[in-house]
């Protein structure tokens, strides 16, 4: 389904310079604190205002960002929006929005092009493989979003939505409704389908999909698939390559399983073989995971309704994960022992996660082979759209929860060690507290995490409490370094 972009309108056309700062009377600066004791400044410039359309440029600066975050935001209040984005001359972007045409010259290829529509049945079509990243929010309504951009974040909100992605890298969150997500091409996709009876089909690229609450139909693609049914009676079809499947709660049916596939479940599996349903027939490697309900973890989620539902889906997957349920069990024990909750809070635009302990005075650091003081509670800051390389956003959340584990158990490693870099560059020094949650070795005296002489002391976190433990379980590439090296 590829709509044809409209012909040039007969009316006036608008030219927008994405690098413009706007006149002083249309520019304002705001100062905010996304985390305790951290300040950031956002400059907002109004670049265009016409019938149903406003265009703003936002530039956010602060210590949390390697460089300023530059966003060019299109916002339409039309009751129904048809928006087509095509490639113009000399790296310009042409936006046809209902009966208006905009010629956009982005500030640079890093500038994020944001599109926000109002409530209604909207269509957004990104027709070209743009270098600029796109962020699309369509709001409530039965919306259609098609993208061929190299990187796209899509949030469709409530409604029965349809999303089609191409060969780029896509993050999709369709929210409440009976939604369809279809991947076409080699792009990597992370999709959260939210509540409803949803349909998902993968293609050649790596796929991560979480069906959310509801009875879903999930079909893996030709690449590596991570398929999570979540709550509901789901039908999951494994792809022809490698598959890691989390059934979630419900009466689930799995089709096309192979001996190489891994299935994590707390209930009986029903598979389809030659058209017949076969209860509890084991094909592939099955891991039985029994865990506590989400409501009993003691974790608190703060943010929008969309963020809350999204994090709940992440946590339900982790509760059905071999490594994840062990991490959450340890954190739940700390919450019950101390009566101090761990909070997960929404983090926007930051290409990272963060854990802030309730007390960071160094007393939680292990020393001379002895644990430090247990520092309970704390806050995890989580950007649910952020991931690096071939990773999935869930890995960033897991990384920060592993930091929480070290603080609540008094097992934080002090000092620094060389990053485990295997390329041509010399390894820089990295804080041990980061290396240990990735699962990389630290140059320290081995530490006995469980105070059990029968188990070996370690120079990194035990397996369930590392990001690499989750990546390995998901079938993704392990991190060999803490720092992401772009050209090595």
Predicted regions and their residues:
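GD-rich hexapeptide-repeat beta-solenoids
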Residues: 8-13, 66-95, 188, 265-291
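LRR N-terminal entry segment and analogous cap-like coil->beta motifs
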Residues: 98-130
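Glycine-centered beta-turn/loop sites at beta-strand termini
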Residues: 117, 126, 136-138, 147, ...
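A metal-dependent hydrolase signature that marks the N-terminal structural subdomain at the beginning
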Residues: 255-353
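Active-site scaffold of zinc-dependent metalloenzymes
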Residues: 350-395, 404-408
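Active-site or metal-binding loop neighborhoods of secreted/extracellular toxin and effector enzymes
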Residues: 412-488
